[in-house]
């Protein structure tokens, strides 16, 4: 309601004031203005009653405008107001204050109907006559007037004086020098010989309801009103400028919807704007756009009329509060002023500037901007760097826009020129040849048609065509129109021929253009996975930690990673091993030993479970991870070579991946081919006896890519891992929560663990995106309109064969394996990721390069000469035998002996409690083994426990050990044990000990510090045996004894009074003897 009143007061208070002034000026006898309070009261009452029917209010204000502009006379005004407000008799009665004293509304209720009467200067009119209004069309358009003048000129060609008289009469009527009746008499007499023209002239006269001339005061014919002939539903039609005759209302539309469209047509006076609004509604009806887009776009059409906008929201079942949230989310975060300017936040508007004076602050704009503040106005906007796919899409849109712009401009020019041609065709033949046009051809836009003609006729001949159109339009227009139509059809034909190519380019580049990280991440990742970069990063982090955190530099790790998902950890190892087996089968024994024996020691894994899992790679994809790994009492060892042959058989087919096989692969393949022939009989016999090994035939050795693709499945994990069972105490190599592993290594191992961690993190992030895949897939719902138009792109058909696993993570894992085998190319792999993950999985694009780098580091580790000695030291350090305090130091010294002088020593620590893996760079000159803070605390705890127990300390000689006891206080006839026992017994009987003293040891300075407010107390046992009264008497005696001593002490002090001594005594003695 408040909003409606505000609109009424702000937008239409001027019109109400003008209405009051007009009524008072014409009909008030004294010419005095009405009180302003009456106007405000009427506006408030009008707003309160018409807040839910805005179209009634619009009709009322239009009639007031018509009265003010002298379009209707006063009786017409009263009649229309009575029809508009026929449902509001109280408003009609209140309106009497604006009428002259001789006019007044008289209402007499009779049921639902009422009778309207007027009191006039000649008396009241009690019997109203029937008033049936005939409403002609509004004045004809400009072109019809020109055609009428041309026909009159041709009719009066033989008598030019009559034509001049007609022109003079029209000029006098325009200047209010003659009345309408005089003009009508003159024209009728001049066109007496041409009755058809005289009758046509009457169509141009203001004879409709809004164009009746106002008679003199006091001579108005008073007419009654028949409400059945003139109802409120016709008001909107009377107020519109034109109404097509071929419009017919739909029978299924409600009254509210019908009134809404009529009011929209009245508000959107421009026909093209009204058609654009109907097109927007049509898009919503067809399901191309949703309700939010409809409301946000429709606000631009109807925001000027608040009542109509509320009706539109009610039709869409959307509240104003919901619209604000939709519109604010669709628009900018800042308030807008037009399509280009945004209001800056307060902190941006209040920037200090010392170079301005008062005048500059008054005229310069600091609130609204349309240019970024971080860019220079001279240099223009800084365009964001685009990827090649974005460049292709931009170029495609520019080509489409160019064709659309030319076709639209040509169509508009043809339409405009045809209107001029039709107007010229209505002229006589003699006038057509001499008819000329002004510059610009009288079109609303001069630039559009000029650019179109320059585009068709080139710039050299365009000026000649402009002059010809202005001087000889009758001859030039047909030629230009035909040429433009020919060119327009040519451009449309070319556009249709280019549509398939444009659609193909769009299909190839659209998804990639949305993935902005695609290209740049590949370039960065190639640098980030290099050994040089990883080693330099470790050195930089170590120096920064030492500079900013000097106290933590000895114990903190440069890198710390968390491996809390064992399934992803297993999958990471499986992927690296698969790449090595597939592409580099040489040295598999060392690789298998490294993964099955060395890697579990670094990550706290169970060797048996991890070894069974990796047997799927080293023994074949058909290996059962839950089956026992033995045949009888001996393990099956011959199957590994056969499974390797199956996995590396893909190398025999270089046509699949388009690459040449390496020398090592070729050598291994020849060796296996020669060995398979001699071993086939033994293999067959072994498989028959055990039943666990499948014989390998020539067909299996030469299987095609389709068979390899079918054999690639997601690796099956052991049941104990999938079910998360607790196998406490089942295996020898089980890791406890308080057992951590510390190993030492060199640069190749450090680089491998860094690459291994990157691979683990990307697979782990891929697993976490499992929930978002379904959300992304819901957005790929086909639009029925696009399917009907055959422009819908089914991206599923463009993908290669998608694996059929349980989850999307497993499907993606199998796709990575196919990429490693070369079955799927890089482009198809990226399209698969974009289809399921959108732009979230861009880190997986280079996973094959990352796996290759990790496999390369594994080969560097196992092919190094010191690998055998380092692995033996690692296994010896990880043994379950008890270690001494200096074993870690000796282990480190042995590792340093194997390294070159310029090589870096690394320490790898696995903290099983937090599932974290730390890497630290060690100094070669540092002879003290650096330990983490948790390790130091654990060692200190162990030291305190050893200190308290009664046993000999290791590596300490007791040859020269002397006891610090005083021999004179020890009874000679007793031993030390007897003396200690006697003293303890006597102490327990005579005193009560309460131990509360606490101490701590600083790890950095090794200082023993006692905690404040902690102490040991001894209580004599005799006090504990006393009764309460005896205890109080004893305490009072002691208190009195202290008092006497205190008084004597105070008297000996010079300058101290007794009063002061008494006060201090009471304060201190009571504190000393509080029980």
UniProtKB/Swiss-Prot annotation:
<dbReference type="GO" id="GO:0045815">
    <property type="term" value="P:transcription initiation-coupled chromatin remodeling"/>
</dbReference>
<dbReference type="InterPro" id="IPR013194">
    <property type="entry name" value="HDAC_interact_dom"/>
</dbReference>
<dbReference type="InterPro" id="IPR039774">
    <property type="entry name" value="Sin3-like"/>
</dbReference>
<feature type="domain" description="PAH 3">
    <location>
        <begin position="243"/>
        <end position="319"/>
    </location>
</feature>
<keyword id="KW-0804">Transcription</keyword>
<dbReference type="InterPro" id="IPR036600">
    <property type="entry name" value="PAH_sf"/>
</dbReference>
<feature type="compositionally biased region" description="Low complexity">
    <location>
        <begin position="676"/>
        <end position="691"/>
    </location>
</feature>
<dbReference type="GO" id="GO:0005634">
    <property type="term" value="C:nucleus"/>
</dbReference>
<dbReference type="GO" id="GO:0000122">
    <property type="term" value="P:negative regulation of transcription by RNA polymerase II"/>
</dbReference>
<keyword id="KW-0156">Chromatin regulator</keyword>
<dbReference type="Pfam" id="PF02671">
    <property type="entry name" value="PAH"/>
</dbReference>
<keyword id="KW-0597">Phosphoprotein</keyword>
<dbReference type="GO" id="GO:0060090">
    <property type="term" value="F:molecular adaptor activity"/>
</dbReference>
<comment type="function">
    <text>Has a role in chromatin assembly and chromosome segregation. Involved in the deacetylation of histones.</text>
</comment>
<dbReference type="GO" id="GO:0000785">
    <property type="term" value="C:chromatin"/>
</dbReference>
<keyword id="KW-0677">Repeat</keyword>
<dbReference type="GO" id="GO:0070822">
    <property type="term" value="C:Sin3-type complex"/>
</dbReference>
<feature type="modified residue" description="Phosphoserine">
    <location>
        <position position="641"/>
    </location>
</feature>
<feature type="compositionally biased region" description="Basic and acidic residues">
    <location>
        <begin position="658"/>
        <end position="675"/>
    </location>
</feature>
<dbReference type="InterPro" id="IPR031693">
    <property type="entry name" value="Sin3_C"/>
</dbReference>
<keyword id="KW-0805">Transcription regulation</keyword>
<dbReference type="Pfam" id="PF16879">
    <property type="entry name" value="Sin3a_C"/>
</dbReference>
<comment type="subunit">
    <text>Heterotetramer of alp13, clr6, prw1 and pst2.</text>
</comment>
<feature type="domain" description="PAH 2">
    <location>
        <begin position="138"/>
        <end position="208"/>
    </location>
</feature>
<dbReference type="GO" id="GO:0003714">
    <property type="term" value="F:transcription corepressor activity"/>
</dbReference>
<feature type="modified residue" description="Phosphoserine">
    <location>
        <position position="643"/>
    </location>
</feature>
<protein>
    <recommendedName>
        <fullName>Paired amphipathic helix protein pst2</fullName>
    </recommendedName>
</protein>
<feature type="region of interest" description="Disordered">
    <location>
        <begin position="647"/>
        <end position="700"/>
    </location>
</feature>
<feature type="domain" description="PAH 1">
    <location>
        <begin position="28"/>
        <end position="102"/>
    </location>
</feature>
<dbReference type="InterPro" id="IPR003822">
    <property type="entry name" value="PAH"/>
</dbReference>
<dbReference type="Pfam" id="PF08295">
    <property type="entry name" value="Sin3_corepress"/>
</dbReference>
<dbReference type="GO" id="GO:0032221">
    <property type="term" value="C:Rpd3S complex"/>
</dbReference>
<keyword id="KW-0539">Nucleus</keyword>
């Amino acid at each position: 309601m408040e909003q409606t009143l505000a609109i009424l007061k702000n937008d239409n208070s001027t019109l109400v004031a003008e209405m009051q002034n007009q009524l008072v000026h014409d009909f008030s006898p004294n010419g005095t203005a009405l009180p302003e309070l009456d106007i405000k009261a009427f506006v408030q009452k009008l707003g309160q009653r018409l807040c839910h029917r805005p179209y009634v209010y619009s009709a009322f204000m239009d009639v007031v405008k018509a009265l003010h502009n002298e379009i209707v006379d006063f009786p017409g005004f009263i009649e229309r107001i009575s029809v508009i407000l026929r449902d509001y008799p109280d408003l009609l009665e209140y309106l009497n204050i604006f009428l002259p004293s001789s006019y007044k509304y008289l209402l007499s209720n009779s049921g639902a109907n009422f009778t309207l009467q007027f009191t006039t200067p000649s008396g009241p009119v009690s019997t109203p006559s029937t008033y049936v209004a005939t409403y002609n069309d509004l004045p004809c358009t400009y072109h019809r007037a020109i055609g009428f003048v041309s026909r009159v000129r041709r009719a009066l060609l033989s008598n030019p004086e009559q034509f001049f008289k007609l022109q003079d009469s029209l000029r006098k009527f325009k200047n209010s020098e003659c009345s309408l009746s005089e003009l009508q008499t003159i024209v009728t007499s001049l066109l007496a010989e041409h009755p058809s023209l005289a009758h046509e002239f009457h169509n141009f006269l203001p004879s409709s309801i809004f164009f009746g001339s106002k008679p003199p005061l006091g001579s108005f014919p008073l007419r009654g009103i028949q409400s059945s002939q003139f109802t409120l539903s016709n008001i909107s039609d009377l107020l519109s400028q034109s109404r097509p005759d071929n419009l017919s209302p739909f029978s299924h539309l409600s009254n509210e919807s019908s009134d809404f469209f009529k009011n929209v047509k009245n508000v959107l006076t421009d026909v093209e704007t009204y058609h654009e609004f109907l097109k927007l509604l049509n898009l919503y009806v067809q399901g191309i756009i949703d309700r939010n887009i409809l409301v946000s776009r429709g606000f631009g059409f109807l925001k000027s009329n608040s009542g109509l906008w509320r009706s539109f929201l009610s039709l869409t079942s959307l509240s104003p509060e919901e619209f604000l949230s939709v519109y604010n989310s669709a628009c900018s975060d800042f308030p807008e002023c037009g399509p280009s300017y945004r209001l800056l936040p307060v902190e941006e508007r209040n920037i200090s500037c010392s170079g301005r004076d008062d005048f500059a602050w008054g005229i310069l704009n600091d609130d609204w901007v349309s240019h970024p503040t971080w860019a220079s106005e001279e240099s223009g906007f800084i365009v964001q760097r685009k990827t090649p796919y974005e460049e292709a899409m931009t170029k495609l849109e520019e080509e489409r826009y160019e064709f659309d712009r030319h076709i639209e401009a040509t169509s508009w020019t043809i339409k405009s020129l045809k209107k001029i041609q039709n107007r010229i065709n209505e002229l006589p033949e003699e006038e057509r040849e001499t008819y000329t046009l002004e510059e610009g051809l009288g079109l609303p836009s001069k630039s559009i048609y000029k650019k179109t003609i320059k585009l068709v006729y080139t710039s050299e001949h365009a000026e000649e065509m402009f002059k010809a159109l202005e001087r000889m339009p009758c001859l030039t227009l047909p030629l230009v129109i035909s040429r433009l139509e020919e060119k327009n059809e040519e451009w449309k034909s070319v556009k249709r021929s280019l549509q398939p190519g444009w659609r193909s380019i769009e299909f190839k580049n659209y998804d990639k253009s949305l993935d902005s990280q695609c290209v740049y991440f590949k370039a960065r990742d190639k640098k980030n996975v290099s050994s040089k970069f990883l080693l330099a990063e470790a050195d930089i982090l170590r120096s920064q930690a030492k500079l900013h955190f000097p106290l933590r530099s000895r114990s903190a790790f440069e890198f710390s990673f968390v491996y809390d998902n064992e399934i992803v950890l297993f999958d990471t190892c499986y992927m690296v091993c698969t790449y090595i087996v597939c592409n580099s089968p040489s040295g598999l024994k060392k690789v298998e030993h490294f993964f099955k024996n060395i890697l579990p020691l670094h990550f706290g894994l169970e060797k048996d479970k991890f070894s069974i899992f990796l047997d799927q790679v080293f023994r074949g994809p058909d290996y059962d991870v839950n089956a026992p790994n033995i045949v009888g009492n001996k393990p099956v060892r011959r199957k590994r070579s056969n499974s390797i042959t199956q996995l590396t058989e893909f190398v025999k087919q270089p046509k699949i991946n388009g690459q040449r096989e390496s020398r090592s692969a070729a050598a291994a393949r020849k060796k296996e081919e020669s060995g398979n022939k001699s071993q086939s009989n033994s293999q067959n016999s072994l498989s028959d006896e055990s039943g666990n090994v499948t014989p390998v035939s020539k067909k299996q050795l030469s299987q095609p890519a389709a068979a390899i693709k079918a054999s690639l499945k997601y690796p099956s994990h052991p049941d104990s891992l999938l079910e998360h069972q607790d196998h406490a105490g089942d295996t020898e190599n089980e890791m406890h929560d308080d057992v951590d592993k510390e190993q030492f290594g060199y640069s190749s191992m450090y680089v491998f663990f860094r690459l291994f961690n990157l691979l683990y993190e990307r697979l782990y992030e891929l697993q976490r995106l499992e929930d978002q895949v379904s959300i992304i897939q819901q957005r790929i719902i086909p639009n029925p309109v696009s399917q009907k138009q055959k422009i819908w792109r089914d991206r599923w058909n463009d993908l290669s064969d998608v694996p059929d696993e349980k989850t999307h993570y497993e499907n993606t894992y199998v796709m990575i394996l196919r990429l490693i085998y070369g079955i799927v190319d890089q482009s198809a792999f990226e399209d698969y990721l974009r289809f399921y993950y959108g732009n979230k999985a861009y880190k997986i694009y280079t996973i094959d390069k990352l796996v290759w780098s990790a496999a390369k580091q594994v080969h560097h580790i196992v092919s190094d000469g010191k690998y055998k000695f380092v692995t033996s030291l690692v296994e010896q350090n990880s043994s379950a035998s008890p270690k001494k305090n200096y074993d870690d130091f000796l282990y480190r010294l042995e590792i340093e002996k194997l390294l070159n002088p310029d090589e870096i020593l690394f320490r790898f620590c696995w903290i099983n409690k937090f599932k974290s893996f730390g890497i630290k760079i060690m100094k070669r000159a540092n002879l003290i083994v650096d330990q983490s803070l948790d390790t130091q605390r654990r060692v200190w705890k162990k030291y305190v426990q050893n200190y308290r127990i009664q046993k000999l300390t290791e590596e300490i000689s007791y040859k020269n050990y002397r006891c610090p006891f005083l021999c004179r206080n020890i009874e000679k006839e007793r031993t030390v044990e007897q003396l200690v026992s006697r003293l303890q017994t006597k102490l327990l009987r005579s005193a009560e000990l309460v131990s509360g003293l606490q101490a701590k040891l600083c790890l950095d300075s090794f200082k023993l510090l006692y905690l404040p407010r902690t102490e040991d107390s001894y209580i004599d046992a005799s006090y504990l045996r006393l009764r309460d009264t005896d205890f109080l008497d004893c305490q009072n005696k002691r208190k009195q004894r202290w008092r006497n001593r205190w008084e004597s002490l105070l008297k000996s002090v010079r300058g101290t009074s007794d009063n002061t001594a008494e006060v201090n005594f009471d304060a201190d003695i009571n504190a000393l003897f509080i029980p």
